[in-house]
Amino acid sequence: MIKSDIASTVPIIAIDAMGGDVGLDTTLAAVLSVKNQYPALKLILVGNQSIIEKHSLFPQIASQMEIVHAEQIVAMDESPSSVLRHKNDSSMWRALELVQQGKADACVSAGNTGALMGCARFILKMLPNISRPAICSTVPNRYGHVHWLDLGANVSAKPEQLKQFAIMGSELSKAVDNIASPTVGLLNVGSEAIKGNDIVKEANTLISATDLNYVGYVEGNDLFLRKDLNVVVCDGFVGNVALKTVEGIAKFIQYGMEAEFKRSFFSRLTALVALPALKRLKKRIDPRMYNGATLLGLQGLVIKSHGNADPIAFANAINLARLEVENNVLHRICEQLQLNPEHDQ
């Protein structure tokens, strides 16, 4: 449901209570945390009502919570086609239906990414003039953070689709970062004009012709070291591989530091001295604080939480949905698409 102006009422967010690897323990703890922070926010739990009501945390939120019953659960390894055929009474499906029916402003799910994308496209449909959806996530860098898309919705993308991603990413940054004119970069193998394949070169031409604050080609290291960068655009194959590489390197460094600090008495002493700085660094790059990827390009707001998110991480995904509803991201994107009409898709 696309609203025509900035939301004037309290956001209503549908929560897929049964999705993800950890289930209700995480979901209800996160909901309790968010409700304590934003008491007026309306959250709808979607899932097996009997199981939800029997959970030990439910009495603490029962008076503030609506439950929409759904009999089925989407497994994390279930194929999108199987879910579309057989799981139309699942918590994921029913949560998306609430958005489609205008009974909720956004849906948050920690469920199967492929199934969520497939169901969202089927139930909510694509925005006018958007041919492909994109997964947009926020990653920390030296100067704050950057919004990065596409991170896996499409293994390839046409130049026109990369332009669409740039428009959607820019509007998302305006909404959640409160930046009037976010900078947008196109991920490439080099910053020189001669670098890149034909798709990237044509996308560069198309994005340059828009009214976006486009800074041209950017390289992988720019995501973390460049100050004047708010949005980075690429196809889903490149984005997903790059993101998982970064996540792997981060874990490698973490494990390596832990091993070295435990190696001897002196290294333990060094760790003790460095502990305050290490805690600050850990908090700054804590992936839980950036949990929640937006499925852009749909006629409804959908936030994908990490499947193994803890309560802190899942609460941040809910808060991202709240922020996007309050700033009417969908309407902003639609307005920009009208200012930058499509050519061949």
UniProtKB/Swiss-Prot annotation:
Main location (coarse class): cytoplasm
SUPFAM superfamilies referenced in this protein's UniProt entry, alphabetically: Isocitrate/Isopropylmalate dehydrogenase-like
Reactions mediated catalytically: a fatty acyl-[ACP] + phosphate = an acyl phosphate + holo-[ACP]
Sorted UniProt keywords: Cytoplasm, Lipid biosynthesis, Lipid metabolism, Phospholipid biosynthesis, Phospholipid metabolism, Transferase
An MF annotation (GO) of this entry: phosphate:acyl-[acyl carrier protein] acyltransferase activity
EC number, as in UniProt: 2.3.1.274
Gene Ontology biological process: fatty acid biosynthetic process; phospholipid biosynthetic process
Pfam families the record matches: FA_synthesis
Compartments where found: Cytoplasm
Any GO CC annotation of this UniProt entry: cytoplasm
Pathway field: Lipid metabolism; phospholipid metabolism
Stated family: Belongs to the PlsX family.
UniProt function note: Catalyzes the reversible formation of acyl-phosphate (acyl-PO(4)) from acyl-[acyl-carrier-protein] (acyl-ACP). This enzyme utilizes acyl-ACP as fatty acyl donor, but not acyl-CoA.
Subunit structure: Homodimer. Probably interacts with PlsY.
Entries under NCBIfam families matching the protein: plsX (TIGR00182)
Protein name: Phosphate acyltransferase
